[in-house]
Curated annotation (Swiss-Prot):
Record-given protein name: tRNA N6-adenosine threonylcarbamoyltransferase
Alphabetical list of CDD domains matching this protein: ASKHA_NBD_TsaD_bac (cd24133)
UniProt subcellular location: Cytoplasm
Reported function: Required for the formation of a threonylcarbamoyl group on adenosine at position 37 (t(6)A37) in tRNAs that read codons beginning with adenine. Is involved in the transfer of the threonylcarbamoyl moiety of threonylcarbamoyl-AMP (TC-AMP) to the N6 group of A37, together with TsaE and TsaB. TsaD likely plays a direct catalytic role in this reaction.
Cofactor: Fe(2+)
Provenance organism: Trichlorobacter lovleyi (strain ATCC BAA-1151 / DSM 17278 / SZ)
InterPro entries in the cross-refs: ATPase_NBD, Gcp-like_dom, KAE1/TsaD, TsaD
Residues binding substrate: V133, V134, S135, G136, G137, D166, G179, D183, N273
Any Pfam family: TsaD
Gene Ontology MF terms: iron ion binding; N(6)-L-threonylcarbamoyladenine synthase activity
Known catalytic reactions: L-threonylcarbamoyladenylate + adenosine(37) in tRNA = N(6)-L-threonylcarbamoyladenosine(37) in tRNA + AMP + H(+)
């Protein structure tokens, strides 16, 4: 099946053409980072307007780069949710319009489902496995028993880890988005220079909390006579990142042991973080388990990642009608398509 995928859940307008849920023929991502940087975060109204501006040229570019026409597209997968409602509506409206005009089967895919299956574009992982999804809006642990079969084990009770990175970067005067810059500066610092808390580290649940860590950074900065720079800034970034990674690793290890799983998948934008990738590799080596972390190009928001689930659903005859709408909130364990799959 040649599938067109469309993603507009936040601040990237993306489209991709993928064959048989594996072979990426094209993947186009138009980022709005520069647009939102001056506001220190994503402005929903601006994001929606930018999606409206870019959706048609992005889809056209994806088709051109793949060397296919709309007449050759056999299915359309689109991010239905969760995300910014106005942004989602742009992608869903485009997908429904193409499906109607060209009589192409359509399916809505969960954004997080895309992230946790993104690595399948490189190499499928046998089920069941544990999935850690870390991004600007999510920090979730799932047990995955098959495509469409997800059970949540733990989630953040406040800030997502990517949000904590961006807010900390703002406190440090690094601008938005600052996660990648903190990661780069951390590589030159000492992870033990500043003792930051590890929220919920010893809590029996598999939930996360990062708002307190962000507050701890603010408290530390208020005690300093000047804005940190140079080696001091590097140490602060390294110490913050060490705290984040320790919490993520400990909770992930606890989930693996609780569920008796031998395979781990890490996805989402924060999976680009070099410190986290290294920490998870160390965990996998120590526990002798299989680890999959997609290449960075598949970690951030993109449309190609939707094709794995989209192709599986459409191939099994699971499709949505034109009454399908975008939804800002949509728990992954309520996707409930697995009963229709072989």
């Amino acid at each position: 099946m040649v599938l067109l995928a469309i993603e507009t859940s936040c601040d990237e307008t993306a489209a991709a053409v993928v064959r048989d849920g594996r072979l990426v023929l094209s993947s186009v991502v138009s980022s709005q980072v520069a647009v939102h940087a001056e506001y220190g975060g994503v402005v929903p109204e601006i994001a929606s307007r930018k999606h409206l501006e870019m959706i048609t040229p992005v889809v056209r570019q994806a088709l051109d780069e793949a060397g296919v026409s709309l007449a050759e597209i056999e299915g359309i997968a689109v991010t239905r949710g969760p995300g910014l409602l106005g942004a989602l509506l742009v992608g869903v409206s485009m997908a429904k319009s193409l499906a109607l005009a060209c009589k192409i089967p359509l399916v809505g895919v969960h954004h997080i489902e895309g992230h946790l299956l993104a690595g399948f574009l490189e190499q499928p992982v046998a089920f069941p496995f544990l999935a850690l999804v870390v991004s600007g809006g999510h920090t979730h642990l799932y047990r995955v028993d098959g495509i469409g079969r997800y059970r949540i084990l733990g989630r953040t009770i406040d800030d997502a880890v990517g949000e904590a990175y961006d807010k900390t970067a703002t406190l440090l005067g690094l601008g938005y988005p600052g996660g990648a810059l903190i990661d780069r500066l951390a590589q030159q610092g000492s992870p033990t220079a500043v003792k930051f808390p590890r929220p919920l580290l010893h809590d029996k649940s598999l939930n996360f909390s990062f708002s307190g860590l962000k507050t701890a950074v603010l408290t530390h900065l208020k005690k300093q006579p000047h804005v940190p720079e140079g080696a001091e800034l590097h140490d602060l970034c390294a110490s913050f990142q060490a705290a984040v990674c320790e919490v993520l690793v400990k909770k992930t290890e606890a989930a693996l042991k609780q569920e008796g799983l031998q395979r781990l998948v890490v996805g989402g934008g924060v999976a680009c973080n070099s410190g986290l990738r290294h920490a998870m590799q160390q965990l996998a080596t120590r526990l002798k388990i299989e680890l999959q972390i997609p290449p960075p190009v598949l970690c951030g928001d993109n449309a190609a990642m939707l094709a794995v689930a989209g192709d599986a659903y459409l191939s099994a005859g699971c499709q949505d009608d034109l009454a399908m709408d975008a939804t800002a909130t949509w728990p992954l364990d309520q996707v409930a398509r697995w009963e229709q799959l072989p």
